From Swiss-Prot:
This is UDP-N-acetylmuramoyl-tripeptide--D-alanyl-D-alanine ligase. Pfam families: Mur_ligase, Mur_ligase_C, Mur_ligase_M. GO terms for cellular component: cytoplasm. Keywords: ATP-binding, Cell cycle, Cell division, Cell shape, Cell wall biogenesis/degradation, Cytoplasm, Ligase, Nucleotide-binding, Peptidoglycan synthesis. It catalyses: D-alanyl-D-alanine + UDP-N-acetyl-alpha-D-muramoyl-L-alanyl-gamma-D-glutamyl-meso-2,6-diaminopimelate + ATP = UDP-N-acetyl-alpha-D-muramoyl-L-alanyl-gamma-D-glutamyl-meso-2,6-diaminopimeloyl-D-alanyl-D-alanine + ADP + phosphate + H(+). It is an enzyme of class 6 (ligase). Involved in cell wall formation. Catalyzes the final step in the synthesis of UDP-N-acetylmuramoyl-pentapeptide, the precursor of murein. HAMAP family: MurF. It comes from Synechocystis sp. (strain ATCC 27184 / PCC 6803 / Kazusa). Gene3D superfamilies: Mur ligase, C-terminal domain (3.90.190.20), Mur-like, catalytic domain (3.40.1190.10), MurE/MurF, N-terminal domain (3.40.1390.10). ATP binds at G116, S117, V118, G119, K120, T121, T122.
Length: 454
């Protein structure tokens, strides 16, 4: 937020949820909206959020000491003095969202909302890499993709930005709708619909409907970009959206690409794939479709594109002597797991070993989906399976992979020790599980052996 807001602006943004305001000096401008006193500097406004294990109101004294000139609270606070403005609201999280929505409305740049069951973060990073060839890009950082993170992302917008990419995650109905109402994207992109969070929503159709809330709540003059290869997404989207639509896909669509080795072929033009795997070719095609939507010269990408993904997402490391680690430990779902196993099977090497853990939030589908993962390991003819067996569902992976040499470990250190004694030159390993399983710590311990990214 390089262009400062006045306290009058804050009052305007909060009009629908404001109970009272004291010590308001309309000509005073704030530097930033801050929810964490550890990063607050003099001239900031402190907004006291509440969480399951914290209450931001407890940190108001620290905020004042650090130089906060205004606070947003959901209860009256004594001892602020006569120079600190207090905005009393019904709910500070709602207030945070209203301020972010008001700030976003000051920008006329393309705002791209990205969601999907699988690949939304990778697609966001590919879009950012593409758009950075044409201007200054602002994007969702880390996992700031929920009801708190999206406002934070929007409040970081500045007049220097030419494009903004807002990732939107959900764990239930109504959440994407809320995020779209706040961000008001000019383009809404849905990568796919799968089974992630099926234990919470109950069915793939319910997941599709939740994802398509993006379409229902983006402005009617905006554009939808949809993965034509995902039949359920396309069927569901028709019920939510009748506006301008661009489809993309490896099987068909307005932007139709094909994979030829390590290249994506589009309209006779060969583009080097920034990331390995057919699933990532589809994600890259989504970014190209977006570039076309914006009228950008995507053919400039023939010289190649570099994408730096967050830790645990499509990262490759060289370990020891000619051993490659494929790190996919940040998060997981059935479709993502199966695609990553395909990637491992198609990675040149001597032995291909899967190091897997459980997939979370599958509910009653858990045993069946995990058995499908094991069956995939067996069908691909992988050379070995290592399981971090800290979840009962990993037994179903082992059962599905019956016939594949399988080793199970109850904790990360014992798994690391076994891998160090097992690995041979030419081995290719895939590490894949839901983030909460802790398989990322196994990769981190192995990386202590001084690896290099590849």
């Amino acid at each position: 937020m390089n262009s400062k807001l006045s306290l009058f602006d804050i009052r305007t943004f909060l009009e629908s949820c404001l109970l009272s305001v004291t010590n308001l000096s309309e000509d005073i401008r704030i530097n930033n909206i801050c929810t964490d006193t550890r990063s607050l500097v003099s001239g900031d406004l402190f907004l006291a959020l509440r969480g399951e294990s914290f209450d931001g109101h407890s940190f108001i004294p620290q905020a004042l000491t650090a130089g906060a000139i205004a606070v947003v609270t959901d209860r009256p606070v004594e001892g602020l003095g006569e120079t600190v403005a207090q905005f009393l609201v019904e709910d500070t999280l709602v207030a945070y969202q209203h301020i972010a929505a008001g700030w976003r409305q000051r920008f006329t740049i393309p705002i791209i909302g990205v969601t999907g069951s699988v690949g939304k973060t990778t697609t966001k990073e590919l879009i950012a890499a593409v758009l950075s060839q044409f201007g200054n890009v602002h994007k969702t950082r880390a996992n700031y993709n929920n009801e708190i993170g999206v406002p934070k992302t929007l409040l970081e917008l500045s007049p220097d930005h030419d494009f903004a990419i807002v990732e939107m995650a959900m764990r239930g109905r109504g959440q994407i709708a809320l995020l779209a109402d706040i961000a008001k994207p000019t383009i809404g992109l849905i990568t796919n619909v799968g089974t992630a969070h099926i234990g919470l929503l109950g069915s793939e159709l319910a997941i599709a409907e939740a994802k398509c809330e993006l379409l229902a709540h983006q402005p009617p003059e905006s554009t939808a970009i949809l993965n034509r290869d995902n039949a359920l997404l396309m069927e569901t989207a028709q019920r939510f959206w009748q506006g301008k639509t661009i489809t993309y896909g490896l099987e068909g669509g307005d932007v139709h690409g094909t994979v030829d080795g390590e290249n994506l072929i589009l309209d006779g033009v060969s583009l080097p794939l920034p990331l390995a795997g057919v699933h990532n070719a589809s994600n890259y095609l989504a970014a190209i479709a977006l570039a076309q939507c914006l009228g950008l010269d995507w053919q400039q990408l023939q010289s190649g594109l570099t994408v730096e993904l967050p830790k645990g997402r499509a990262r490759r490391y060289q370990w020891g002597q000619d051993v490659v680690l494929l790190d996919e430990t940040y998060n997981d779902g059935l479709e993502s797991m199966l695609a990553s196993l395909d990637l491992l099977a198609n990675t040149p090497g001597k032995r291909r070993l899967a190091v897997l853990g459980a997939m979370k939030e599958l509910g009653d589908y858990g045993p069946t989906f995990h058995q499908r993962v094991g069956a995939k390991v067996k069908a691909l003819g992988l050379d070995g399976l290592f399981l971090l067996a800290n979840d009962p569902n990993t037994d179903a992976i082992a059962a599905g992979a019956n016939g594949v040499e399988t080793q199970s470990f109850s904790d990360g250190p014992s798994l690391v020790a076994a891998l160090k004694t097992t690995l041979q030159p030419g081995d290719r390993l895939l590490f894949k599980a839901s983030n909460s399983v802790g398989l990322g710590a196994v990769v981190s311990q192995l990386l202590a052996e001084n690896p290099t990214s590849v």
